[in-house]
Amino acid sequence: MPLLSLQNKNLFLEISPEMGASITKFCDRKKNKNIFRPFPKTKKITKNNCYFSGYFATVPYFWVIHKDTFFYNNKYIKLSRTHPLEPNTIHGEGWVKKWKVKKQTKTSA
């Protein structure tokens, strides 16, 4: 799946729908400087390499859910593991699923 590029006169953003909308490049066009760490050219765009991106979507929750379980409304809720390299459920599901772009313009997707 190709990378998605968005830009305006000041900023350039490159997103990988394949890696859960991970940001592979985000830079200031006028200063020609990276704002986020760019995705390494030596790495392949895969689910397991999203950690190398400058940012990935942590939705619908952020951080670690210890032993994949939390307590809510007087009951325990068990979640499935979100990433094969992680021992606990972590960062929601948005970053480990392919995203489908429904609409794109030069500056939005």
Feature map (PLM): residue ranges:
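Surface-exposed acidic/polar loop and edge beta-strand patches at domain peripheries
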Residues: M1-A109
